[in-house]
């Protein structure tokens, strides 16, 4: 029986041949992963803690696993609209209700790493977006706009925050 060609099989083939690039933007989690510090009057988000359940020992002789405890805003994450008061009444405002297809799309990268390296409080403005579009073309609906700062190279809480 011949295999059926589907959009998914074509995507997989293009990925395997290196014609499409998927970029993993996640950062490793660890004890030094930065966590936002809020004023003391607000509840704090915990950092990452890992507790070993078993490590090939009497608690589990053939496996290694852990309990991981962290706030939902620790490390690389997505804020659903419901996270902010402005999104609490929107339809499909939680991660389980947002169609998965909305999380995948072509990306446009505005590289301001030099500026962010020179000015820690550098802000992306509409003028940066318009300049990028002037050089690369209009950002299409459904595209992701990524703002490159190279802050991912900063290690530890002090350097990042």
Task: Please place each PLM-identified region on the residue numbering.
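Active-/binding-site microenvironments in catalytic and ligand-binding cores
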Residues: 1-161
């Amino acid at each position: 029986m011949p295999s059926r060609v589907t959009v998914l099989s074509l995507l997989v083939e293009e990925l395997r041949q290196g014609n499409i690039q998927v970029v993993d933007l996640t950062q490793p989690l660890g004890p030094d992963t930065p966590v936002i510090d809020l004023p003391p009057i607000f509840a704090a988000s915990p950092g990452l803690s890992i507790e070993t359940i078993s490590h090939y020992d009497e608690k589990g002789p053939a496996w290694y696993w852990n309990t991981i405890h962290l706030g939902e805003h620790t490390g690389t994450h997505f804020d659903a609209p419901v996270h902010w008061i402005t999104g609490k009444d929107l339809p499909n405002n939680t991660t389980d209700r947002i169609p998965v297809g909305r999380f995948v799309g072509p990306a446009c990268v505005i590289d301001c790493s030099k500026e962010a390296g020179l000015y820690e409080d550098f802000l992306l403005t509409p003028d940066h977006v318009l300049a990028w579009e002037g050089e690369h073309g209009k950002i299409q609906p459904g595209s992701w706009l990524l703002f490159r700062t190279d802050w991912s190279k900063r290690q530890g809480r002090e350097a990042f925050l």
